[in-house]
Swiss-Prot record:
BP terms from Gene Ontology: translation
GO cellular component: cytosolic large ribosomal subunit
InterPro entries, alphabetized: Ribosomal_bL19 (IPR001857), Ribosomal_bL19_CS (IPR018257), Ribosomal_bL19_sf (IPR038657), Translation_prot_SH3-like_sf (IPR008991)
Tagged with keyword Iron: no
Protein name: Large ribosomal subunit protein bL19
Encoding gene per record: rplS
GO molecular function, a single term: structural constituent of ribosome
Family: Belongs to the bacterial ribosomal protein bL19 family.
Key words of the record: Ribonucleoprotein, Ribosomal protein
Role: This protein is located at the 30S-50S ribosomal subunit interface and may play a role in the structure and function of the aminoacyl-tRNA binding site.
Top-level lineage group: Bacteria
Amino acid sequence: MDLIKIAEEAFATGKQHPSFKAGDTVTVAYRIIEGNKERVQLYRGVVIKIAGHGDKKRFTVRKMSGTVGVERIFPIESPAIDSIEVNKVGKVRRAKLYYLRALTGKKARIKEKRVNN
């Protein structure tokens, strides 16, 4: 067996996350350790990019904090991620939504895809 695959399986977290794509609005709950205290912080925003494959897969989430856009990159297999929740399913035609960086206000909205539950 390949040594890389053995190492990937050893460090895999084994968590099951929902499937999502660029344009979806997600809430990521991740653990933050400050000194000897640990807390869970929620980060809600639009997925603008999914990159990599396997255990190196990562996604970028963009949110507006006041008037400043904040982007954060999360590795999918990170042990610090508690959960990922898909809030809205977006309707976009691109895999990488870098054009959202230049848009502000209502122009930066993404159409919502209706999902039958």
